Regions:
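N-terminal post-signal-peptidase region of extra-cytosolic proteins
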Residues: 22-24, 53-63, 76-77, 139-140
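Periplasmic N-terminal gating module of Gram-negative TonB-dependent outer-membrane receptors
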Residues: 65-73, 150-152
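Non-catalytic, structured segments within soluble enzyme domains
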Residues: 18, 105, 109-278
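His/Glu-rich zincin catalytic helix
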Residues: 37-65
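Cell-wall polysaccharide-cleaving catalytic domain and substrate-binding groove, primarily
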Residues: 77-90, 96-97, 198-202
Protein backbone atom coordinates (compact mmCIF):
# COMPACT_ATOMS: atom_id res chain seq x y z
CA UNK A 1 0.00 0.00 0.00
CA UNK A 2 2.73 2.45 0.99
CA UNK A 3 4.62 1.63 -2.19
CA UNK A 4 1.58 2.43 -4.33
CA UNK A 5 0.98 5.70 -2.50
CA UNK A 6 4.61 6.73 -2.91
CA UNK A 7 4.54 5.81 -6.61
CA UNK A 8 1.35 7.82 -7.14
CA UNK A 9 2.85 10.80 -5.34
CA UNK A 10 6.00 10.53 -7.42
CA UNK A 11 4.04 10.51 -10.67
CA UNK A 12 1.89 13.45 -9.58
CA UNK A 13 4.82 15.58 -8.52
CA UNK A 14 6.85 14.88 -11.64
CA UNK A 15 4.00 15.02 -14.14
CA UNK A 16 4.45 18.73 -14.75
CA UNK A 17 8.22 18.55 -15.08
CA UNK A 18 8.82 18.16 -18.80
CA UNK A 19 12.57 18.18 -18.16
CA UNK A 20 12.29 15.00 -16.06
CA UNK A 21 12.62 12.90 -19.20
CA UNK A 22 15.15 15.23 -20.83
CA UNK A 23 18.70 14.08 -21.32
CA UNK A 24 21.79 16.11 -20.59
CA UNK A 25 22.40 16.39 -24.33
CA UNK A 26 18.89 17.79 -24.87
CA UNK A 27 19.34 20.45 -22.18
CA UNK A 28 22.71 21.41 -23.63
CA UNK A 29 21.29 21.53 -27.16
CA UNK A 30 18.42 23.79 -26.06
CA UNK A 31 20.80 26.26 -24.40
CA UNK A 32 20.74 29.60 -26.21
CA UNK A 33 23.36 32.33 -25.70
CA UNK A 34 21.98 35.85 -25.47
CA UNK A 35 24.14 36.81 -28.47
CA UNK A 36 23.62 35.38 -31.95
CA UNK A 37 26.74 34.73 -34.00
CA UNK A 38 26.46 35.98 -37.58
CA UNK A 39 28.85 34.25 -40.00
CA UNK A 40 29.80 35.08 -43.58
CA UNK A 41 29.67 32.62 -46.48
CA UNK A 42 33.06 31.23 -45.49
CA UNK A 43 31.96 30.63 -41.93
CA UNK A 44 33.98 33.53 -40.53
CA UNK A 45 32.46 35.54 -37.68
CA UNK A 46 31.04 38.89 -38.76
CA UNK A 47 29.51 39.97 -35.48
CA UNK A 48 27.85 38.87 -32.29
CA UNK A 49 24.46 40.56 -32.06
CA UNK A 50 22.55 40.49 -28.80
CA UNK A 51 19.15 38.96 -29.42
CA UNK A 52 18.01 38.34 -25.82
CA UNK A 53 17.92 41.48 -23.73
CA UNK A 54 16.38 39.83 -20.66
CA UNK A 55 19.49 37.93 -19.54
CA UNK A 56 23.16 37.77 -20.41
CA UNK A 57 24.24 34.25 -21.34
CA UNK A 58 27.53 33.37 -22.99
CA UNK A 59 28.49 30.11 -24.62
CA UNK A 60 27.97 26.71 -23.02
CA UNK A 61 31.19 25.79 -21.21
CA UNK A 62 32.29 22.17 -20.83
CA UNK A 63 33.23 21.14 -17.31
CA UNK A 64 36.77 20.39 -18.48
CA UNK A 65 37.04 24.06 -19.49
CA UNK A 66 36.14 25.35 -16.02
CA UNK A 67 39.10 26.12 -13.78
CA UNK A 68 39.78 23.61 -10.98
CA UNK A 69 39.75 26.54 -8.55
CA UNK A 70 36.15 27.39 -9.42
CA UNK A 71 34.97 23.80 -9.16
CA UNK A 72 36.69 23.53 -5.78
CA UNK A 73 35.22 26.81 -4.50
CA UNK A 74 31.71 25.93 -5.67
CA UNK A 75 31.67 22.53 -3.99
CA UNK A 76 33.06 23.96 -0.74
CA UNK A 77 30.42 26.67 -0.74
CA UNK A 78 27.36 24.81 -1.99
CA UNK A 79 27.72 21.06 -1.68
CA UNK A 80 30.73 19.55 0.11
CA UNK A 81 29.43 15.99 -0.28
CA UNK A 82 28.36 16.35 -3.91
CA UNK A 83 30.24 13.24 -5.01
CA UNK A 84 29.01 11.21 -2.05
CA UNK A 85 25.22 11.70 -2.02
CA UNK A 86 22.56 10.61 -4.51
CA UNK A 87 20.86 13.96 -5.00
CA UNK A 88 19.89 14.73 -1.40
CA UNK A 89 22.45 15.24 1.37
CA UNK A 90 20.60 13.49 4.17
CA UNK A 91 23.49 14.09 6.55
CA UNK A 92 23.14 17.84 6.13
CA UNK A 93 19.35 17.60 6.20
CA UNK A 94 19.37 15.65 9.44
CA UNK A 95 21.74 18.13 11.06
CA UNK A 96 19.49 21.07 10.16
CA UNK A 97 16.58 22.03 12.37
CA UNK A 98 13.19 21.06 10.95
CA UNK A 99 11.99 24.65 10.99
CA UNK A 100 14.58 25.75 8.41
CA UNK A 101 15.32 22.42 6.80
CA UNK A 102 14.34 23.61 3.32
CA UNK A 103 14.75 27.35 3.85
CA UNK A 104 16.37 28.93 0.79
CA UNK A 105 18.39 31.20 3.06
CA UNK A 106 20.17 28.15 4.42
CA UNK A 107 21.89 26.19 1.68
CA UNK A 108 23.28 23.55 4.01
CA UNK A 109 20.65 20.98 2.99
CA UNK A 110 20.12 22.18 -0.58
CA UNK A 111 22.46 20.23 -2.85
CA UNK A 112 23.70 21.27 -6.28
CA UNK A 113 21.49 18.56 -7.77
CA UNK A 114 18.43 19.94 -5.98
CA UNK A 115 19.24 23.46 -7.12
CA UNK A 116 19.68 22.25 -10.70
CA UNK A 117 16.32 20.47 -10.51
CA UNK A 118 14.74 23.80 -9.54
CA UNK A 119 16.48 25.59 -12.42
CA UNK A 120 15.36 22.97 -14.93
CA UNK A 121 11.82 23.20 -13.60
CA UNK A 122 11.87 26.97 -14.11
CA UNK A 123 11.51 27.73 -10.40
CA UNK A 124 14.91 29.32 -9.84
CA UNK A 125 14.84 31.00 -6.45
CA UNK A 126 11.19 31.71 -5.54
CA UNK A 127 11.00 34.90 -3.50
CA UNK A 128 8.44 33.53 -1.10
CA UNK A 129 10.12 30.18 -0.67
CA UNK A 130 8.80 26.80 -1.76
CA UNK A 131 5.64 25.15 -0.51
CA UNK A 132 5.89 21.77 1.19
CA UNK A 133 4.73 20.01 -1.99
CA UNK A 134 7.38 21.88 -4.00
CA UNK A 135 10.06 20.95 -1.47
CA UNK A 136 9.13 17.28 -1.63
CA UNK A 137 8.99 17.50 -5.40
CA UNK A 138 12.45 19.06 -5.52
CA UNK A 139 13.81 16.19 -3.42
CA UNK A 140 12.28 13.59 -5.72
CA UNK A 141 13.40 15.49 -8.81
CA UNK A 142 16.99 15.52 -7.56
CA UNK A 143 16.88 11.77 -6.95
CA UNK A 144 15.57 11.15 -10.47
CA UNK A 145 18.20 13.45 -11.92
CA UNK A 146 21.01 11.57 -10.20
CA UNK A 147 19.71 8.29 -11.59
CA UNK A 148 19.76 9.45 -15.20
CA UNK A 149 22.67 11.91 -15.34
CA UNK A 150 26.33 11.52 -14.40
CA UNK A 151 27.81 13.74 -11.70
CA UNK A 152 29.98 15.62 -14.19
CA UNK A 153 26.91 16.35 -16.32
CA UNK A 154 25.00 17.69 -13.32
CA UNK A 155 27.85 19.98 -12.33
CA UNK A 156 28.40 21.17 -15.90
CA UNK A 157 24.72 21.97 -16.45
CA UNK A 158 24.51 23.74 -13.09
CA UNK A 159 27.48 25.98 -13.90
CA UNK A 160 25.92 26.96 -17.22
CA UNK A 161 22.37 27.55 -15.96
CA UNK A 162 22.81 29.08 -12.51
CA UNK A 163 22.11 32.84 -12.18
CA UNK A 164 25.04 34.72 -10.69
CA UNK A 165 24.20 38.42 -10.45
CA UNK A 166 21.72 40.73 -12.12
CA UNK A 167 21.30 39.63 -15.72
CA UNK A 168 24.31 37.28 -15.66
CA UNK A 169 23.41 33.61 -16.12
CA UNK A 170 26.02 30.90 -16.44
CA UNK A 171 29.73 30.83 -15.84
CA UNK A 172 30.76 32.14 -19.28
CA UNK A 173 28.77 35.36 -18.89
CA UNK A 174 30.02 35.82 -15.33
CA UNK A 175 33.71 35.20 -15.99
CA UNK A 176 33.85 37.32 -19.14
CA UNK A 177 31.86 40.20 -17.66
CA UNK A 178 33.26 40.49 -14.13
CA UNK A 179 36.76 39.13 -14.70
CA UNK A 180 37.38 39.70 -18.41
CA UNK A 181 38.50 36.15 -19.11
CA UNK A 182 37.26 32.68 -19.98
CA UNK A 183 36.14 30.31 -17.23
CA UNK A 184 39.26 28.15 -17.51
CA UNK A 185 41.42 31.08 -16.39
CA UNK A 186 39.73 31.91 -13.07
CA UNK A 187 42.11 31.88 -10.12
CA UNK A 188 41.31 31.12 -6.47
CA UNK A 189 40.33 34.70 -5.61
CA UNK A 190 38.00 35.03 -8.61
CA UNK A 191 36.57 31.58 -7.96
CA UNK A 192 35.78 32.50 -4.35
CA UNK A 193 33.89 35.61 -5.48
CA UNK A 194 31.97 33.57 -8.07
CA UNK A 195 31.00 30.98 -5.45
CA UNK A 196 29.85 33.74 -3.10
CA UNK A 197 27.58 35.12 -5.83
CA UNK A 198 25.93 31.72 -6.27
CA UNK A 199 24.96 31.81 -2.61
CA UNK A 200 23.62 35.36 -2.73
CA UNK A 201 23.49 36.76 -6.29
CA UNK A 202 22.35 40.26 -5.42
CA UNK A 203 24.01 40.74 -2.04
CA UNK A 204 25.91 43.95 -1.40
CA UNK A 205 29.67 44.07 -1.87
CA UNK A 206 30.46 43.66 1.81
CA UNK A 207 28.34 40.52 2.09
CA UNK A 208 29.89 39.08 -1.07
CA UNK A 209 33.37 39.81 0.26
CA UNK A 210 32.67 38.21 3.64
CA UNK A 211 31.37 35.07 1.99
CA UNK A 212 34.20 34.98 -0.58
CA UNK A 213 36.82 35.45 2.12
CA UNK A 214 35.40 32.50 4.03
CA UNK A 215 35.43 30.32 0.90
CA UNK A 216 39.00 31.36 0.09
CA UNK A 217 40.06 30.47 3.63
CA UNK A 218 38.49 27.02 3.26
CA UNK A 219 40.30 26.52 -0.04
CA UNK A 220 43.62 27.40 1.55
CA UNK A 221 43.00 25.11 4.51
CA UNK A 222 42.11 22.17 2.30
CA UNK A 223 45.11 22.84 0.10
CA UNK A 224 47.35 22.82 3.17
CA UNK A 225 45.86 19.52 4.40
CA UNK A 226 46.44 17.96 0.99
CA UNK A 227 50.03 19.20 0.97
CA UNK A 228 50.66 17.72 4.40
CA UNK A 229 49.70 14.26 3.14
CA UNK A 230 52.76 14.35 0.90
CA UNK A 231 56.17 13.47 2.38
CA UNK A 232 57.74 16.75 1.24
CA UNK A 233 54.89 18.78 2.72
CA UNK A 234 54.86 17.35 6.23
CA UNK A 235 55.62 19.95 8.87
CA UNK A 236 54.93 22.85 6.51
CA UNK A 237 53.63 26.04 8.07
CA UNK A 238 49.93 26.81 7.55
CA UNK A 239 49.20 29.49 4.93
CA UNK A 240 48.41 33.00 6.14
CA UNK A 241 44.72 33.88 6.31
CA UNK A 242 43.28 35.50 3.18
CA UNK A 243 43.58 39.27 2.92
CA UNK A 244 39.90 40.16 3.18
CA UNK A 245 40.57 43.89 2.80
CA UNK A 246 42.32 43.35 -0.53
CA UNK A 247 39.56 40.95 -1.55
CA UNK A 248 36.99 43.64 -0.76
CA UNK A 249 38.69 46.09 -3.12
CA UNK A 250 38.96 43.41 -5.79
CA UNK A 251 35.29 42.39 -5.47
CA UNK A 252 34.15 46.03 -5.49
CA UNK A 253 35.93 46.64 -8.79
CA UNK A 254 34.73 43.37 -10.34
CA UNK A 255 31.07 43.90 -9.44
CA UNK A 256 31.10 47.30 -11.13
CA UNK A 257 32.05 45.87 -14.51
CA UNK A 258 29.32 45.59 -17.11
CA UNK A 259 31.20 45.01 -20.39
CA UNK A 260 30.85 41.59 -21.99
CA UNK A 261 34.05 41.06 -23.97
CA UNK A 262 32.51 38.71 -26.55
CA UNK A 263 30.22 41.36 -28.11
CA UNK A 264 32.63 42.81 -30.67
CA UNK A 265 32.73 41.91 -34.35
CA UNK A 266 34.35 42.94 -37.60
CA UNK A 267 31.32 44.12 -39.56
CA UNK A 268 28.43 45.16 -37.28
CA UNK A 269 26.25 46.77 -39.97
CA UNK A 270 26.57 43.82 -42.35
CA UNK A 271 25.88 41.43 -39.49
CA UNK A 272 22.68 43.17 -38.44
CA UNK A 273 21.48 43.28 -42.05
CA UNK A 274 22.16 39.56 -42.44
CA UNK A 275 20.31 38.84 -39.20
CA UNK A 276 17.24 40.77 -40.39
CA UNK A 277 17.25 38.88 -43.68
CA UNK A 278 17.68 35.47 -42.03
Amino acid sequence: MRTRVFAALLVALCAGNTWALATFDAIKSDFQPSDTQVLDRQGELLQRVRTDATVRRGQWVALADVSPALRHALLLSEDKRFYEHSGVDWQAATAAAWGNLWNQRTRGASTITMQLAGLLDGEGRPAGGRSMVQKIGQTLDATLLERSWRKDQILEAYLNLVPFRGELVGIDALSRTLFGKAAHGLDAREAAVAAALVRAPNANVRQVTQRACGVLGQMQTQGQKLEQTRPAGQGAKPPPPPDCEALDMFATAALQRRAFDASEGVAPHAARQALREA
